[in-house]
């Protein structure tokens, strides 16, 4: 597979069906949980720590599913969906660099919300800056992330962690 520096929506859907990085490799969720429409930049260099970065975008539409239910009469995109998008991008990057296994979010150090995403907004931009990538028997990415809406940064997340697991059940057993 040739690594690309950007991906359109149809290519991201291939990832959701396990056909972008091959069988047994990280997958993105299918719509409606896929929280971006395109990845505009991927690199193993760059970002705030010069250890890799990902930039992605979501086009907003007042008819998106979450605006209809969160909250009736006061629609706002749930902050947890923006956070999940950041984890999705960390996992996608791990597959992009050749990591294998099923991606699982492992946590984050700190999340701050300083704004909200409303139906009248046009575009959400997600940015990931990698701090550390382990690509051995354990595959794990640690990154900081930012969410902006129409050019204004409104969320920050520090120390996002995603791991790739050959058997995701191992994660449950190790915590029980």
Curated annotation (Swiss-Prot):
The active site is at 70. GO terms for biological process: unsaturated fatty acid biosynthetic process. It catalyses: a (3R)-hydroxyacyl-[ACP] = a (2E)-enoyl-[ACP] + H2O; (3R)-hydroxydecanoyl-[ACP] = (2E)-decenoyl-[ACP] + H2O; (2E)-decenoyl-[ACP] = (3Z)-decenoyl-[ACP]. Its main location: cytoplasm. Pathway: Lipid metabolism; fatty acid biosynthesis. Its EC number is 4.2.1.59, 5.3.3.14. InterPro entries: FabA (IPR010083), FabA_FabZ (IPR013114), HotDog_dom_sf (IPR029069). Keywords: Cytoplasm, Fatty acid biosynthesis, Fatty acid metabolism, Isomerase, Lipid biosynthesis, Lipid metabolism, Lyase. One of its GO terms (cellular component) is cytoplasm. GO terms for molecular function: (3R)-hydroxyacyl-[acyl-carrier-protein] dehydratase activity; trans-2-decenoyl-acyl-carrier-protein isomerase activity. It is found in: Cytoplasm. Necessary for the introduction of cis unsaturation into fatty acids. Catalyzes the dehydration of (3R)-3-hydroxydecanoyl-ACP to E-(2)-decenoyl-ACP and then its isomerization to Z-(3)-decenoyl-ACP. Can catalyze the dehydratase reaction for beta-hydroxyacyl-ACPs with saturated chain lengths up to 16:0, being most active on intermediate chain length. Belongs to the thioester dehydratase family. FabA subfamily. PANTHER family: 3-HYDROXYACYL-[ACYL-CARRIER-PROTEIN] DEHYDRATASE, 3-HYDROXYDECANOYL-[ACYL-CARRIER-PROTEIN] DEHYDRATASE. Homodimer. This is 3-hydroxydecanoyl-[acyl-carrier-protein] dehydratase.
């Amino acid at each position: 597979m040739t690594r690309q520096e950007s991906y359109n929506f149809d290519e991201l859907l291939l990832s959701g069906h396990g056909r972008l990085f091959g069988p047994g490799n990280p997958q993105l969720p299918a719509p409606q949980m896929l929280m971006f429409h395109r990845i505009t930049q991927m690199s193993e260099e760059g970002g705030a720590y010069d250890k890799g970065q990902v930039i992605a975008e979501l086009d907003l539409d007042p008819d998106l599913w979450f605006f209809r239910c969160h909250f009736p009469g006061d629609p706002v995109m749930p902050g947890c969906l923006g956070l999940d998008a950041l984890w999705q991008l960390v996992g996608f990057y791990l597959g992009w660099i050749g990591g294998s296994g099923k991606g699982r979010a492992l946590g984050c150090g700190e999340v701050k919300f300083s704004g909200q995403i409303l139906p009248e907004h046009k575009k959400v931009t997600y940015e990931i800056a990698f701090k550390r990538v382990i690509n051995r028997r354990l595959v794990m990415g640690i990154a900081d992330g930012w969410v902006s809406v129409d050019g204004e940064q409104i969320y920050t997340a520090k120390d996002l962690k995603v791991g790739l697991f050959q058997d995701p059940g191992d994660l449950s057993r190790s915590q029980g």
